[in-house]
Amino acid sequence: MALTFDAHDPGLLAGFWGRVLGRETLRDRHGALLPGSATQVGLLFVLGDAEPAGPQLMHLHLTSTSLAEQQRTVAAALELGAAPLDVGQLPDEGHVVLADPEGNAFCVIEPGSTFLAGCGVLGELACDGTRDVGHFWGRALGWPVVWDQDEETAVQSPDGGTKIAWGGPPLTPRSGRNRQRFDLELTEGDLTAEVHRLAALGATLLRDIADVGVELADPDGNEFVLARG
């Protein structure tokens, strides 16, 4: 799977994230792709002209093994075009909040996080969402739920790596189309059968996408794409 970002300049944004994460940028049929792996979520950047409407519903958490590494990551990101971002964090909090060149928020987490230990550089995709949607995505992806407490949930590949987490209530009001979305690729089996499976789990079919696949919404109303392999 990959996380898709709408971008005014997909190549520029992919180049930024490729250098921050140490990944090669590939030209995908839909945009610029930073391929993932069995343990790291991929990132896909596509052309989109939608301006941000309200608070961001997803953001990335990058991990650090030492304070020096955290400082190097922050310095490198700033040099590549990131900017400090004030989201109300307190001065004594250890993580650093930045915005990428197109304003997408991300955090560079301080060392010592037990929750993100062993998760790799892209440690977490933090999402706004309910407990139910966390369980939906666990079943949809075939990933176990590794955190389920106080309405917060997280899932993780059986191979480990990046966690996808949902913060529970109160939820941020939705406004327009999400600029970050999940992109799933069907590598085997029938597209129609997979759509029926996801619908049985709680997804809603939104539309067909010519030469690509279909767009659905999860139980919280977040759009995602199921593409033919």
Kindly label every feature range from the protein language model.
Residues 91-93, 209-211:
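Short, small/polar residue-rich loop motifs at catalytic or cofactor-binding pockets
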Residues 1-29, 34-86, 99-150, 155-207, ...:
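Glyoxalase I/VOC metalloenzyme domain signal
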